[in-house]
């Protein structure tokens, strides 16, 4: 996010950030996870209803405000994956964003779509960012919704073994305009700063009383 900057409509620069879908909730528990056949059936079912689910998520109008103490935190988003190996693709969150852009362009003429292509207009993001999957071993601790520091568990037990928790984090790039201010902002009139912001995601954690449970924690999700 670009702090203390001119309105984007005045500088014609498109910023990038994470989309949040408050209607997206984790359902079920670890006991519902089965073997490979169960996973295959689950993926098939998801594929059959993928478009319908996306439409519902995009139509979700509920807004959940972060607490005043966590004013740098965004809404809930899904950036957590349980896997035996490092995920090769970004999470569903980014697929939803791409699909929304497709829907927005579907009602445009070909001529308008051509001119709406950022590459044709020479648009750049206001702030440069980097995204990558990180493990709980790299995070170690995080802040939950109550402001308490909790330990992020590296592995999640399942009926047939253990899976690692992976978090898809996005933060401001250490190179480029991060130190010089936001791209496209006239430095003669405005002071600006690229700053990493956070969102809440659900993860398996342990508090200082050794109680293990699923809690919403803050991770880096946009710049």
Curated annotation (Swiss-Prot):
A single GO cellular-component term on record: synaptic vesicle
Any Pfam family hit: NGF
Prosequence residues removed at maturation: 6-114
InterPro entries xref list: Brain-der_neurotrophic_factor, Cystine-knot_cytokine, Nerve_growth_factor-like, Nerve_growth_factor-rel, Nerve_growth_factor_CS
GO BP, sorted A to Z: cell surface receptor protein tyrosine kinase signaling pathway; modulation of chemical synaptic transmission; negative regulation of neuron apoptotic process; nerve development; nerve growth factor signaling pathway; neuron projection morphogenesis
MF terms (GO), sorted A to Z: growth factor activity; nerve growth factor receptor binding
Keyword line: Cleavage on pair of basic residues, Disulfide bond, Glycoprotein, Growth factor, Secreted, Signal
Disulfide bonds: 127-194, 172-223
Glycosylation sites (chain numbering): 107
PROSITE patterns: NGF_1, NGF_2
Transmembrane segments: none
Domain of life: Eukaryota
Annotated signal peptide: 1-5
Localisation per UniProt entry: Secreted
Physiological role: Promotes the survival of neuronal populations that are all located either in the central nervous system or directly connected to it.
Record family assignment: Belongs to the NGF-beta family.
PANTHER family membership: BRAIN-DERIVED NEUROTROPHIC FACTOR, NERVE GROWTH FACTOR NGF -RELATED
Protein's UniProt name: Neurotrophic factor BDNF precursor form
Source species: Calabaria reinhardtii
This protein's encoding gene: BDNF
């Amino acid at each position: 996010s670009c702090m203390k900057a001119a309105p984007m409509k005045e500088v014609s620069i498109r910023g990038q950030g994470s989309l949040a879908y408050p209607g997206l909730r984790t359902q079920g528990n670890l006991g519902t996870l089965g073997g490979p056949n169960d996973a295959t059936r689950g993926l098939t079912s998801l594929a059959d209803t993928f478009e319908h689910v996306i439409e519902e998520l995009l139509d979700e109008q509920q807004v959940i405000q972060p607490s005043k103490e966590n004013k740098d935190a965004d809404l809930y988003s899904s950036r957590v994956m349980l896997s035996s190996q490092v995920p090769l693709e970004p999470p569903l969150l980014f697929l939803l964003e791409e699909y929304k852009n497709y829907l927005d362009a579907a009602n445009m003429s070909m001529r308008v779509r051509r001119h709406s292509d950022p590459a044709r207009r020479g648009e750049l993001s206001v702030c440069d960012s980097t995204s990558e999957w990180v493990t709980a071993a790299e995070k170690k601790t995080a802040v939950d919704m109550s402001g308490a520091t909790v330990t992020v568990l590296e592995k999640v037990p399942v009926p047939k073994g253990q899976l690692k928790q992976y978090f898809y984090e996005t933060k401001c790039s250490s190179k480029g305009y991060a130190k010089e201010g936001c791209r496209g902002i006239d430095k003669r009139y405005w002071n600006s700063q690229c700053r990493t912001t956070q969102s809440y995601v659900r993860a398996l954690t342990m508090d200082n009383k050794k109680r293990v449970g699923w809690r919403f924690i803050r991770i880096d999700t946009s710049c």
